[in-house]
C-alpha cells in the first residue's frame, strides 16, 4: 500500500503534463485521443488503446483516492467517483486547451498551480464532493 498516494499521483501528473508540453509524440497522441472525427488505421488503433488507458487511469484514480482516504489524507466522506471525475475532467480540459491554444497555458509552469488547486479541493471539499447518505 502506497504511503503517500497523493504525492505519487502528483508526481505522475506533473510528468504527464511535462511530457505533453515538451515531446511532440505525446502531443500527437493526445491530439488523436481528443479528436472526435472518425479515424482509420493506426490513428484509430492508437485512439482505441488510449481510451482504454483512460478508463484504467480513472479506475486507478479512484483506487489512489480511496487509499488516501484510508490513510487520513482526504476526508472519509469524499465521494470517490465524483472526486476522480473532477480530477480527470479538469486535467483533460487543461490538456485540450493547451493543444488548441498553447500560448494561453504553460503546462509546465501551471502544473503546480493546477495540482495545488485540485488537491486543495479534495482535502477541503465542498458539500457536493461528499457522499450523500
Identify what each model region corresponds to.
Residues 1-2, 18, 31-34, 48-54:
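Helical cap/lid subdomains and adjacent loops of hydrolase enzymes that gate the active-site channel
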Residues 1-28, 80, 84-87, 127-132:
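Hydrophobic alpha-helical connector segments
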Residues 7-10, 22-24, 43-71, 81-85:
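Amphipathic alpha-helical packing segments from all-alpha helical-bundle domains
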Residues 14-22, 31-41, 117-122:
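Helix-loop "lid/cap" segments that line or gate small-molecule binding pockets
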Residues 19-22, 67, 87-105, 119-130:
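Amphipathic C-terminal alpha-helical segment
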Residues 32, 78-97, 113-118:
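Hydrophobic alpha-helical segments that form the core
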